[in-house]
């Protein structure tokens, strides 16, 4: 057995235990460490001992955010309505520890699926707010270590802007991982694709020097967004009048509607063009019957796809099989999320949402990937909040601070060019997003935008008629009528864009990050301090740091 590894993991666990309340909790940690030691012993022949030892230590640290809360706040875990005893809180924590240790044992049983950290199995990057959090920037950075990058939901309504080697790239359908010259990029079955826009995006990338040939694949099961869908999108928005949703008018909703009505056309249909033509004629007739003002021309649209079908079919494959074969072959797969959790058709602020599921479930339904193949789930959180279009926004600002955030943060939509609404970071919303997705790590982006503010605030609770709300209300009127409780913290004036370590940040900025981490109970691993791909601080987890140092 690698006793040095086990002893380091044990010492790290003991140091963490010393910070926790109650002898039972410390005893449980000792027992958990023993289980971890046995895991190391069992995996000796198949896996590096250090890897399992580190996993063990990290599992024990997984509840650090809960342990650091005060008694009353911690008692709220497990959905308790009233403060409960420390012993009950400890039991809730231990449930988390057991869950994480079971994952370690799964790693031992399936050593080909697990190593240190990310890059094993399927990792996922998801927006945790209302979009525009900076997902593309992290994907651009992480993708250099992955073999396959895949999108699983949404369409050209999504937009990523990335500054890469001094050039600004704008992505809508193509995964931003295409900037990794060694990666294969996939548009999964859950994406709806406007093929003319897709080809235009590829041509723009080619003009900027990106060689995508042979590296971009489209699912034969992906549904197509047609020009008539975009026209219908605009008509629907006009019909809503003052109840407009704020759609991007990219045809996303109508395309998903066709999918659910089972009269849509899929990319793979282009292989059998006579059938495709018949489906197109029927679809145009269906929409003209329901939208007399529609100007769609079936023959003209069929001609467009006849001209491009060969080029598209060269990129079209069964991506479900491709992804799962890549997984079995040990390829590193990264899912690049589009839109965000609060725009999810089921979990977002309905009806002011998108028409797909840009939360964790879309990885399975939009990529054909089994949930037991998922590894890291990374939530992207802007250091403040933004939203494009209509819909409730509890922490929205209409003052000089809101103007500062919009101006300094260059908050204009990549897809629409519309100015984004800005506000303070919303913890109740983030806790809800964290609950839905089960984030393993967070990336806090655009911390530099808060520079120059004398005071910064964090929305920590919603109140309605004198009562604190539990969770995120599904009723929009209740959400709109709620009052946000804020915590105020000191701001900072120092330029942080050149900071490379957490310790280099101003003390006030460090306190802000740590407070957000404490409130969410999830480790903030990455901190964005500027627009470039390298303007990111990577934080070592406290227990991982203790383990590596061996102190």
From Swiss-Prot:
The active site is at residues 132, 160. GO terms for molecular function: adenylosuccinate synthase activity; GTP binding; magnesium ion binding. GTP binds at residues 131-137, 159-161, 420, 446-448, 528-530. InterPro entries: Adenylosuccin_syn_GTP-bd, Adenylosuccin_syn_Lys_AS, Adenylosuccinate_synth_dom1, Adenylosuccinate_synth_dom2, Adenylosuccinate_synth_dom3, Adenylosuccinate_synthetase, P-loop_NTPase. Binds 1 Mg(2+) ion per subunit. Mg(2+) binds at residues 132, 159. GO terms for cellular component: cytoplasm. It is an enzyme of class 6 (ligase). It comes from the Eukaryota. Its main location: cytoplasm. Plays an important role in the de novo pathway and in the salvage pathway of purine nucleotide biosynthesis. Catalyzes the first committed step in the biosynthesis of AMP from IMP. Belongs to the adenylosuccinate synthetase family. This is Adenylosuccinate synthetase.
